[in-house]
């Protein structure tokens, strides 16, 4: 975009801020014709603006070394260290960061991934309206795998026997949706967020989302999106938020016009606090505003009783009610996938857990990429 702005003569200079947190070599790579190696800012705000407004050191989700360059150093293997054979199991954000960083340092790295593509949870995230740029992170890591010489084994589910020859095993095997202990959770109208985003199971017109964390909000945006996303279609964004790019309206402000939501959605949480209170400090408000625009019912203080043909039976504000819904989507947390750990440790192998396999309570790409990078830097 910046190149096009200059080429079109629309500006003499393009200023950037967050993109240089994501990749300090942005300009050098562009000048060298290596734009495909730029670690692109995904506009998430999670480690830059959110940190700033919390009084924390500014950094970057996709580049944890930003503002920590003298602390988190990536040095070639030397001295009392020796190059190791490293197996990284799982090619999500944590595994990708670990594998590429370890290989840059001189370790011999093999990356195992049971899927036929890299990305893990980012392959789900990039489908969410407004998160399309997450695909750029996978493009970046794909190129880094090539450049750093990581041996990538896609479509291969590693077993303990496959990993015996490695000096270090890193389990970045991710998570699986947590199934709550609610009567009727096995009813045909119940699906998980993974069923919806990955497997594309059909979803009805009336939907209840159990769980209003980050995943719940993402699924709500996904299910209510009607037509192209405003993140990739500026005219849609302008219409939704009442922006008159022609300035025919006073101050460039016009009456918002929005598509009707694709579905009727209720976003439910057990906690009695404000729905979405745990979202990012600088982005939570926009998610809640979008939900309001799309007529999503955001309901706190819900006790789930059972699910049956009639719908979702619950207690809300002390009153029993039945939500007449076609589909119930479980966004009720995750469980770590780390079955290999016990067998590997029993064999005496060095095993490290990173990403969701380490802490599955809330999916956190910032923590995952930081963990992967820091571990690789320490090997």
Predicted feature locations:
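Helix-enriched interaction subdomains in cytosolic or periplasmic regions
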Residues: 42-57, 166-182
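Short, hydrophobic/aromatic-rich segments at coil-to-beta transitions
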Residues: 308-313
């Amino acid at each position: 975009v910046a190149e096009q702005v200059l080429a079109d003569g629309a500006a003499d200079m393009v200023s950037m801020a967050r993109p240089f947190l994501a990749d300090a070599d942005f300009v050098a790579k562009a000048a060298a014709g290596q734009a495909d190696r730029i670690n692109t800012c995904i506009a998430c705000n999670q480690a830059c603006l959110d940190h700033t407004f919390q009084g924390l050191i500014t950094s970057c989700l996709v580049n944890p070394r930003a503002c920590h360059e003298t602390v988190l150093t990536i040095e070639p293997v030397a001295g009392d260290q020796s190059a190791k054979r490293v197996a990284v199991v799982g090619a999500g954000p944590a595994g990708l960061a670990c594998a590429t960083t370890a290989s840059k340092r001189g370790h011999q790295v093999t990356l195992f991934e049971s899927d036929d593509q890299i990305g893990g949870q980012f392959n789900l995230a990039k489908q969410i309206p407004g998160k399309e740029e997450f695909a750029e992170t996978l493009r970046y890591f794909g190129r880094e795998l090539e450049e750093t010489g990581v041996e990538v084994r896609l479509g291969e589910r590693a077993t303990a026997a496959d990993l015996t020859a490695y000096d270090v095993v890193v389990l970045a095997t991710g998570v699986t949706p947590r199934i709550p202990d609610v009567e009727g959770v096995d009813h045909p109208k119940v699906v998980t967020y993974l069923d919806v985003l990955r497997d594309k199971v059909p979803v009805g017109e009336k939907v209840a989302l159990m769980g209003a964390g980050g995943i719940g909000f993402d699924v709500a945006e996904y299910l209510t999106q009607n037509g192209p996303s405003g993140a990739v279609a500026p005219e849609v964004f302008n219409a939704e938020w009442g922006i008159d790019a022609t300035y025919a309206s006073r101050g460039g402000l016009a009456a918002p016009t929005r598509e009707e939501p694709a579905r009727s959605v209720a976003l439910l949480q057990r906690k009695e606090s404000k729905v979405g209170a745990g979202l990012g400090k600088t982005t939570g408000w926009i998610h809640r505003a979008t939900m309001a625009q799309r007529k999503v019912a955001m309901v706190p203080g819900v006790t789930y009783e059972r699910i049956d043909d009639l719908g979702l039976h619950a207690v809300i504000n002390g009153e029993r009610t039945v939500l007449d819904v076609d589909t119930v989507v479980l966004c009720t947390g995750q469980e770590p996938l780390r079955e290999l750990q016990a067998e590997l440790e029993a064999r005496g192998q060095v095993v490290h857990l990173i990403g969701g396999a380490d802490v599955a309570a809330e999916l956190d790409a910032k923590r995952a990429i930081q963990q992967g990078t820091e571990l690789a830097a320490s090997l």
